[in-house]
Regions:
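Contiguous surface segments at macromolecular interaction interfaces
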Residues: 1-35, 51-53, 64-132
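Short edge-strand/loop segments of extracellular domains
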Residues: 59-63
């Protein structure tokens, strides 16, 4: 299997969006081969439907056991197993609606896109489209 250059991660709750941006951390149970340097595109429900709201580059991957007790309790509550720490996170000025991207042809929506692996050319095309 070819390794991914990055992934799509969906931020499921509106209140978690600011938490991700403020802490540069994303807690997940998604069983992927996370690696330092991978790019993650953030997807969230917006007024336009599902839309890309930004992206980040992974700096570190922490197991639940490496986290603070408070973080471990939150992980237990939500079933998360890892924390992705980002080197930086960029918020798009305007969300990029999924239906305006090449990914619309996949016929996937919402949680079905969570954890979807992407190659570098797909990542770059989506980021360029969102920032363009």
């Amino acid at each position: 299997m070819v390794e991914a250059d990055g992934y799509i991660l969906r931020i499921a709750k509106k209140e978690w969006i600011e938490k991700v941006y403020n802490s540069a951390m994303y807690y997940t149970s998604s069983p992927r081969k996370w690696q330092k340097g991978q790019t993650v595109l953030f997807l969230a429900k917006t007024e336009f439907g599902d839309a890309f709201i930004g992206y980040g580059v992974i700096e570190n991957i922490h197991s639940k056991e490496e986290l603070s007790q408070e973080e471990q309790r939150e992980c237990d509550t939500w079933g998360w197993r890892k924390a992705l720490e980002f080197k930086y996170i960029i918020r798009f000025n305007k969300p990029l609606a999924l239906k305006e991207t090449s990914l619309k042809d996949l016929g996937l929506r919402g949680k079905c896109l969570h954890g979807l692996p992407l190659k570098a050319d797909q990542l770059n095309a989506l980021i360029d489209q969102a920032e363009g």
